[in-house]
């Protein structure tokens, strides 16, 4: 089962050790998923904050896939 994180700071720490990050855009929410060796972590972000969050995630993630 995926682990949903509520804190962006906590998610950034996970992204640093993630193998792959994925961005899935919906109508009301943008989901950012970070796959580590053991778990899949998700963070839900409103579309208004998407740009600032993705900017930080792109800097730390090794492999970013946009769906």
Curated annotation (Swiss-Prot):
Keywords: Ribonucleoprotein, Ribosomal protein. It holds the Pfam family Ribosomal_L38e. The lineage of its organism: Archaea, Thermoproteota, Thermoprotei, Desulfurococcales, Desulfurococcaceae. One of its GO terms (molecular function) is structural constituent of ribosome. GO terms for biological process: translation. Gene3D superfamilies: 3.30.720.90. Transmembrane segments: none annotated. GO terms for cellular component: ribonucleoprotein complex; ribosome. This is Large ribosomal subunit protein eL38. Coiled coil: none annotated. Belongs to the eukaryotic ribosomal protein eL38 family.
């Amino acid at each position: 089962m995926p682990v949903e994180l509520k804190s962006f700071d906590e998610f950034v720490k996970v992204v640093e050790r993630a193998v792959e990050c994925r961005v899935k855009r919906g109508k009301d929410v943008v989901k950012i998923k970070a796959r580590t060796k053991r778990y899949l972590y998700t963070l839900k972000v409103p579309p208004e904050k998407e740009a600032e969050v993705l900017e930080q995630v792109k800097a730390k993630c090794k492999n970013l896939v946009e769906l």
